[in-house]
Amino acid sequence: VRRHVLFAEEEIGSGDLLMIVKNNYHYTGKQQQQDRQENPEQQPGDTNFIANGDTARLRRIRRFEDFYGFRFAQASLVFPDYDDMELECQVLLDTLSSESPALTREQSSRLFFAVAEDYADIPSKAKRYKEVRENPYFNAMQVKFAYAVTCHKAQGGQWRCVFVDRMLFGEETISRDLLRWLYTALTRATEKLYFINFDERFFEDK
């Protein structure tokens, strides 16, 4: 969609729509701490974490970085579902084009131990572990482009206009699982709904 409809050729750029693909607790806590320092009288927000499936708009990229065998972007993300909350964070770019939903277990372990090497001089194992858990690269937002999403990822969200492509479900005959999938897909639209690659047997004759 991004390349053939929006004619975007760069790896990622300002304005791109992204979906978070793994819960992230690091940056919201950091942002709330900064807000309290800047405005002590301000009431703390109720956004404790960014959830898997949340969408964000990429406002700007400060720089690209290659660390620990992975590629990152230091970026600013705006979250429309959280009153346009803006977070400065590291974004992990490897997940954009990977086949897996997020980093695999092997990749996560590789990143963990690569980051841990930076703290090898800390004698306490518990303190080393704590440093890794607070490292911005280890906690980078794992994202994918959100111009088209699976029905599973779309659960809980709604859009004015929705395109439903049945071919993504496969050639399976009408079954209970397919009908459940259809119900979820069809109820994501609030105004317009378009059916793609649907056989006419799915529609009643008038």
Locations of regions flagged by a protein language model:
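Core RecA-like ATPase module of SF1/SF2 helicases and allied nucleic-acid translocases
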Residues: 1-205
